């Protein structure tokens, strides 16, 4: 996930990028609902909330099924049944999770859930969150965060080489050099095919 190498979380990275550039595409997400509107599959927000959410309803569950059911109850606003799990210590009994009264505050990062870690949203790992982001209509095959980082990297690679190429082509007329250079000439220079004319 990159934590051991010091890679920031998705929202912390977006905060840093936005502070450096002011670029709207990397503006940090303000709530779980905001994040849900910018991922490929909006219902995936249930899995993100189950994994990273800090609502008491989620943290009170001991099993993955329980955490996911709690996230479903928060997102959908419908009671969810959790199956029994006798293998847990202590065993988990079958139970029903009802939607909490503050679920909309949690999803919108308002009320008691405003600020701070935004209900766990600021803990979403860069790699997982970045892969889940929707592909921009005119932005390549990556989500907005990874697309910005990729473009930034490519531009800096090109900038590093730009003076080399400028000095090598100074005084050349590109059209005059391209016109007599036929494809067969290129093949003859780079292979042992001989005369192709």
Label each PLM-derived region with a short phrase.
Residues 1-197:
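Terminal regions of secretory-pathway proteins
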